[in-house]
Amino acid sequence: TVMLPDTVEEPEIRKMMQDAEETCEKLHMEILVGHTEITNVVKQPLISVTGVGKMKKENLCTVSQIRPDQDIIVTKWIGLEATTILAKEKEDELKKRFPAVLIDTAKDFDQYLSVVPESRIAVEHGVSSMHDITEGGVFGAFWEMASGAGVGLEVDLKKIPIRQETVEICNYFGVNPYQIMSSGSMMIAADDGHELVRKLEQAGIHAVVVGRTNSGNDRILRNGEDVRYL
């Protein structure tokens, strides 16, 4: 379902559908049905999508499969989605403060928003759980993964991958990069995280083992000598 403001022009709608079709083609997906509505109820495009897929039962990964003493891997870099949105919506303001190349690079972060490539590699490797990091950021994902599995975790904050563009833009707007929308980054629990990281890096996907699960209840974040709890 696509709801568009009454200020939208037909070329914009055509471009939107073209982008959607091209993306689906890359991912070997199809758009089955849709509804488009022009209304003065919304001020910017509002899109709702329901995706349906299937997989072999033996390949199903759920949070309940996470066990103590597993590695926690984060792919690509956190904050990609929020960074690219801010760079596009506040481009003029940001370019008064930062070099144009930094903002232009941040605008292009939307090229990393699909997690299909790493999910395919993770399934082939054999993992316990995969979690797309969205609203609530990486801190929210840590909490959701640990609470859903009933395990504790300990994470090294300094190992969490983040781009300098995200750091600069978040500092400018006074937002926490660990709590912003991070679509494009995936959190994975696996027995041999370092081997999975090696496979991901071979495929050109940055990934880091940031911590481990444990049998306790605490969700611990370490930053050098400092310790905090989620």
Which residues fall in each region the model found?
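Helix-biased detector of long, well-ordered alpha-helical tracts
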Residues: T1-L230
